[in-house]
Amino acid sequence: GTTVEIDVKRNGETMHFTVERSEISMPTVQSAMAGDDIGYIHIFSFGKHTADDFRDQLASLKIAGAKKLIIDVRMNPGGMIYAVTDVANQILTKGTVVSYHTKNGESESYDIEGIEDPLPMVVLIHKNSASASEILAGAVQDKQEGTIIGENSYGKGTVQAVFDAGEQKALKISIAEYRTPSGKTIDKVGIHPDIEVSQ
């Protein structure tokens, strides 16, 4: 990568450093066995590598004997739509995961091929589970393929677009809203858990 020159003044003395820039990869998925046959997967956000990391860790948990899943999206602010639909494709049956609807009546659904025999699962949510994490929880709940446990989620269900405003400025506006497979609105409502547990 490229380098940057940094001067640090400490105790009256100036020290000069040349630092090489590099990409920092932050893991978005962590997993562990939570019992003899229970796999636990924590998804911190839905980014570029999330679906592949989820696939690898889910496979490892199955090899370790996981026959049930706990998927934790607490404190998950969301992320990329393709990442959450790819994760859903690995754990849910065929069908719609989410749809979006514009004010002028246009809509599009995100469908998956899915799997034939999903593992029994619970999804943990709370007040800071937002956007893509709510899409996953909403799909699990609407398809009745797992139990949602925790607190009502954040309620961030809008689609944004960024427009170049010139002079190194941009305008980000909401252009549509997400809905669960059954058509429930997420925005300002959130996902209500099947079992409420305050955290």
Label the model's feature ranges.
Residues 1-156, 160-166:
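Cleft-lining beta-strand/loop regions that shape enzyme active-site pockets
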Residues 15, 186-187:
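Generic structural signal for well-ordered beta-strand positions
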Residues 41, 171-173, 186:
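Short hydrophobic-aromatic micro-motifs
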Residues 165-177:
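Short acidic, Pro/Gly- and aromatic-enriched capping/linker segments at domain boundaries
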Residues 180:
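Short, acidic, Ser/Thr-enriched surface-loop or helix-capping motifs
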Residues 188-199:
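Conserved helicase C-terminal RecA-like lobe
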